[in-house]
Design a protein with these regions (language model features):
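Glycine-rich phosphate-binding P-loop
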Residues: 137-156, 186
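A structural signal for isolated positions on well-ordered beta-strands in alpha/beta enzyme cores
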Residues: 68-69, 138
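Short, structured loop/turn "capping" segments at alpha-beta junctions
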Residues: 121-125, 152, 158-164, 231-235
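Short coil/loop residues immediately preceding or within conserved phosphate-binding loops
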Residues: 132-135, 157, 172
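Canonical P-loop GTPase G-domain recognition
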Residues: 77-139
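Conserved active-site beta-strand-loop modules that form the wall/rim of enzyme catalytic pockets
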Residues: 101, 151, 181-184
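Helix-rich effector regions associated with P-loop NTPase G domains
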Residues: 2-41, 48-49, 54-68, 74, ...
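Short beta-strand/turn micro-motifs composed of small residues
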Residues: 45, 71, 141
């Protein structure tokens, strides 16, 4: 639930962010057609925003199926952040496997967990007098959370188009992962309406929705507000001095106001072009050049 989130540094005041292009709507229709054919759902989320990248319809889709929750981009947050989330999910009765598809960290554990789930499914088939068969798994998640990069790691060669951009995978395709597991790489799916605008902002910051959906300057300002709210949170990984050293503008006094900070930094770096400066700030965050920053942290773990 969104109540698990904390440390947001005030209200987020950006115009409503909505993004549901035709190819996403089509992807959801394709996905629903294939759900009956799969035994295992491998859900992939983003470690920086593990709640915002959870699809609200997921429980409806995974009903009666094995569900493996993979949190990708582990290397982009602090160990304290992912350990806190691991405990939080455990308290909800949900085991998680953490990995980083780009560096390969934890990918073997994902593979082992998927094969284990497959073995359990085939054991159940045997007990019912049915013959074992390769398990059919579906990777599911928001656009740009790294599903295709993870599949490429799992099969150890590039078989699926993969790029850091929302909506690169447009069609469904099967990939053989060992002799006992077939994987279906599905395009990213989003809810038709982004009702939780705080989550929508996080998706925009992590480049999980198309740039046409939001105003870059306003999202950059909201990002700065978010950092100010998170800086005192243990595990968030916000170090304002990195920002100040990189851009030469202190986050204090008058320039502690995000609009003034963006204006002053644009004067220094982009000839006063605030839109270009906003894009640079967002790109730097997305490439981890501002440190390992978790935009979402669990409120507390109830033991």
């Amino acid at each position: 639930s969104a109540r698990a989130l904390s440390g947001f540094g005030g209200a987020v005041s950006t115009p409503a962010i909505q993004w549901y292009p035709g190819h996403i709507a089509k992807a959801e229709q394709q996905l629903k057609r294939h759900l009956d054919k799969v035994d295992l759902i491998i859900e992939v989320r983003d470690a920086r925003i593990p709640l915002s990248t959870g699809h609200p319809h997921l429980n409806r889709w995974i009903h009666g199926k094995h569900h493996l929750l993979v949190i990708n981009r582990r290397d982009m947050v602090t160990p304290a952040a992912w350990e806190a989330w691991e405990q939080w999910f455990k308290a909800q009765g949900q085991r998680t496997v953490w990995c980083d598809a780009k560096s390969g960290t934890g990918v073997k554990q994902v593979q082992q967990a998927a094969i284990r789930a497959g073995n359990q499914l085939n054991e159940r088939r045997r007990n019912r007098g049915m013959r074992p068969r390769p398990v059919r798994a579906l990777t599911l998640g928001f656009p740009n959370v790294g599903k295709s990069a993870l599949i490429n790691r799992l099969v150890k060669k590039k078989v699926v188009a993969s790029a850091r951009r929302a909506g690169v995978t447009r069609t469904l395709r099967w990939v053989r992962l060992g002799q006992d597991l077939d994987l279906l790489d599905a395009p990213g799916v989003l809810p038709p309406r982004l009702d939780d605008q705080r989550a929508a902002l996080h998706l925009a910051l992590c480049d999980d929705i198309g740039q046409a959906a939001y105003d870059g300057e306003l999202v950059a300002q909201a990002f700065l507000r978010l950092l100010l709210g998170l800086k005192s949170r243990e595990g968030a990984g916000v170090v304002l001095s990195i920002l100040e050293e990189r851009y030469g503008t202190p986050v204090a006094g008058r320039t502690a106001d995000p609009a003034f900070w963006l204006e002053a930094t644009a004067e220094r770096h982009t000839s006063g072009d605030k839109a270009r400066m906003a894009q640079r700030l967002l790109d730097d965050f997305r490439r981890s050049l501002l440190g390992s920053i978790a935009l979402e942290l669990p409120e507390k773990v109830v033991s």
